[in-house]
């Protein structure tokens, strides 16, 4: 009984996120936020359940890389490409709002996310077709992401939709000038790939994404800018979609989101943060994603340097990304995911406190 009480699982996260959104709705005197979250949670359940049946009929099954942890081989043949169905309700919402508001910001947001969605779809499709864990080559995927990101950044910068001023507080403002361009590129490509790297354990990326979208939506509300209100709605809808998907993606996963889902989610976070000048706060909220990505960069970098210097590569971690390191240390998959969720919740609290204090 004690073990069950202490377990922090999908239901625990859903209840916590729901109460947090009720509190947010109460504080900002607008219950549309909790309404949007609940609506898209159930839309996600519906889309994922029906999508799962379609995926099984089409035999779209996950291939597991041989160099990964041995306990992952049992995940082979799990239905994948769930992100295809996860994102459909969001695209419909975004398209409707974009048409009604005739907003260039929202139009660029829609095109950018859809570009990453197609990139992920191609990667997933080729992976299944070739019966390998990877579809597009790393360079091919990076080129596609880069082209999409550069088009968005240049158009947004030209129309003054990206603010070069990084506002940390009322008295601490940094003017990035032209350097906002490479920073924006790093944010967009970086966060999308970081979410993709985090999507290696059942429920890890979906759970963390649901948490981060809540934090980002709340932070945008705290800016008290009427024109940004719609972005909070989009964030809370994505939070609901991610947690709805988590119902089927938590351990043991019945479906994976694939690159279609992870790249789309990351692109949504990055693009919204850039358009709402929330990059600094997102960097705190997305601490788990960033650490996962950094663990890969450090692992590869150290290995290459030591191999060149000592003719024998050394590794910092047993395996990267970081969640695999803990797996090989003997920590159970569910426990790793639960702890990462808890850390992410603390990062949301930290980011919001800093927003209030600064």
Curated annotation (Swiss-Prot):
UniProt keyword Cell membrane, yes or no: yes
Principal cellular location given in the protein's record: membrane
Any GO CC annotation of this UniProt entry: plasma membrane
Enzyme Commission number(s): 2.7.8.13
Species this protein is from: Prochlorococcus marinus (strain MIT 9215)
Keyword set, alphabetical order: Cell cycle, Cell division, Cell inner membrane, Cell membrane, Cell shape, Cell wall biogenesis/degradation, Magnesium, Membrane, Metal-binding, Peptidoglycan synthesis, Transferase, Transmembrane, Transmembrane helix
Protein name: Phospho-N-acetylmuramoyl-pentapeptide-transferase
Membrane-spanning parts: 27-47, 81-101, 106-126, 147-167, 171-191, 201-221, 228-248, 255-275, 278-298, 336-356
Catalytic activity reported: UDP-N-acetyl-alpha-D-muramoyl-L-alanyl-gamma-D-glutamyl-meso-2,6-diaminopimeloyl-D-alanyl-D-alanine + di-trans,octa-cis-undecaprenyl phosphate = di-trans,octa-cis-undecaprenyl diphospho-N-acetyl-alpha-D-muramoyl-L-alanyl-D-glutamyl-meso-2,6-diaminopimeloyl-D-alanyl-D-alanine + UMP
Pathway in which the depicted protein is active: Cell wall biogenesis; peptidoglycan biosynthesis
One Pfam short name: MraY_sig1
EC class of the enzyme, as a word: transferase
Family: Belongs to the glycosyltransferase 4 family. MraY subfamily.
Membrane topology of this protein: Multi-pass membrane protein
Protein function: Catalyzes the initial step of the lipid cycle reactions in the biosynthesis of the cell wall peptidoglycan: transfers peptidoglycan precursor phospho-MurNAc-pentapeptide from UDP-MurNAc-pentapeptide onto the lipid carrier undecaprenyl phosphate, yielding undecaprenyl-pyrophosphoryl-MurNAc-pentapeptide, known as lipid I.
Source taxon at top rank: Bacteria
HAMAP family in the record: MraY
GO molecular function: metal ion binding; phospho-N-acetylmuramoyl-pentapeptide-transferase activity; UDP-N-acetylmuramoyl-L-alanyl-D-glutamyl-meso-2,6-diaminopimelyl-D-alanyl-D-alanine:undecaprenyl-phosphate transferase activity
Cofactor(s) for this UniProt protein: Mg(2+)
Subcellular location: Cell inner membrane
Record has Ribonucleoprotein as a keyword: no
